[in-house]
Each structure stands twice: as C-alpha cells, then as structure tokens.
C-alpha cells in the first residue's frame, strides 16, 4: 500500500521479473531472480507457472484475436495437451462468468470485462501466487465489489495474493500482512488482525 509514485508497481515488476534490481538480490525457490536466470527457459517456465502477474492496465496483457484464444494462450505455452488447455479455458470462463465474451475481441471489451479476461488468462495457468497491480483502478463500483469478493474467494482457496493499492479499504480487506511504502520509499510492515 502507498501513494502514487512511491514504488508499488516497480516492486511488483521486480517480483515478477519484468525489471531487475540494481542492488541486492531476491530469490524464487532458492534461485536468484535476475535477467540471466529468467533467460533460462526451464527456470523461467517454472517461475511463470507459479507466479501470475495482472497489470494495472489490462490492455498491456491482452493481444489475441478473441477471448478464448487469449485465455488458452498461457496453458498452450506451458505445453499442456489440447484437451487440458480446453478444460482449463472452459473452467475459468465459467468461473468468471464470461462465456458471452468467448468469441469477442479483447480490445472491444469494457474495462471491467478486460480485467476479468486478464484474470482468467492468469488463472488458466493455475499459479500459486497472483501479483495484482492496482486491481480496482478504472473499474465501476459494481465491478470493484465483485472483484474484491472474487479475490477473497481465491485467498480462501489457498492462493497467495500480492496486491499493490492506494485503496485503504482494499488493503485491509485482503491483507494478512500489509507493507506500506511511504513517499520517501520507507517501508513499514503491519500484520492484520
């Protein structure tokens, strides 16, 4: 949690290997995460199967010609059988209630629909952890309420959620542990009740 510009998104990009630390190290499964390790196809595949990143701007992660192709892209890249790809795709489409969007082009969807598709894309790979950058940004109240409930359901199902937000209510609703980044980049950790 923190205000705009304090480094929340940069921290999440570091955690997901989209940018690299200039100093210090951090690890995944005992291995240092850096440009070299993520160029190793075996390590990169293992990492991205276990950690899913959902961008603040869903347009950044949507690129296929229709929603079904978009959601099936990740499982195909994992080398799963077409039968398993279809099962996972159908399962997350049903879970997120987006069957009516299956054949639609992602760039023609509303902001809330795009966010649901972006989440479906990541969930189709069944990662252990979801990293979400400002998940409520740009969503109407109804979609925000739905998304908070959905994230709580994922948390109850055992998913690890790492969420950046400047929304106090969301932070306190979702967090077991809250890391607050100040404007001066000072970090404070708070354990929620």
Positions of predicted regions on the chain:
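Helix-to-loop junction immediately C-terminal to a conserved catalytic motif
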Residues: 16
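Conserved ABC transporter NBD signature motif
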Residues: 24-36, 47
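Conserved ABC ATPase "signature" region
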Residues: 83-101
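Conserved ABC ATPase signature
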Residues: 105-109, 113
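Hydrophobic anchor residue at the start of the ABC signature
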Residues: 119
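Catalytic Walker B motif of ABC-type/P-loop ATPase nucleotide-binding domains
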Residues: 130-133
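H-loop/switch region of ABC-family ATPase nucleotide-binding domains
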Residues: 165-166
């Amino acid at each position: 949690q923190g205000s705009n510009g304090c480094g929340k998104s940069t921290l999440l990009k570091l955690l997901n290997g989209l940018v690299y630390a200039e100093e210090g190290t951090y690890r995944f499964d005992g291995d240092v995460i850096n440009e070299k390790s993520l160029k190793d196809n075996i390590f990169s595949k293992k990492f991205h199967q276990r950690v899913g990143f959902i961008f603040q701007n869903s347009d950044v992660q949507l690129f296929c010609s229709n929603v079904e192709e978009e959601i099936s892209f990740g499982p195909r890249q994992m080398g799963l059988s077409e039968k398993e790809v279809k099962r996972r795709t159908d399962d997350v489409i049903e879970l997120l209630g987006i069957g009516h969007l299956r054949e639609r082009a992602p760039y023609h969807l509303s902001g809330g629909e795009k966010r649901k598709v972006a989440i479906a894309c990541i969930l189709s790979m069944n990662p252990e952890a979801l990293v979400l950058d400002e998940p409520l940004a740009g969503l109407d109240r109804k979609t925000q309420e739905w998304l908070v409930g959905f994230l709580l359901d994922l948390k109850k199902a055992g998913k690890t959620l790492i969420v950046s937000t400047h929304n106090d209510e969301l932070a306190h609703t979702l967090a077991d542990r809250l890391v607050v980044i100040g404007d001066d980049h000072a970090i404070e950790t708070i354990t929620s009740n």
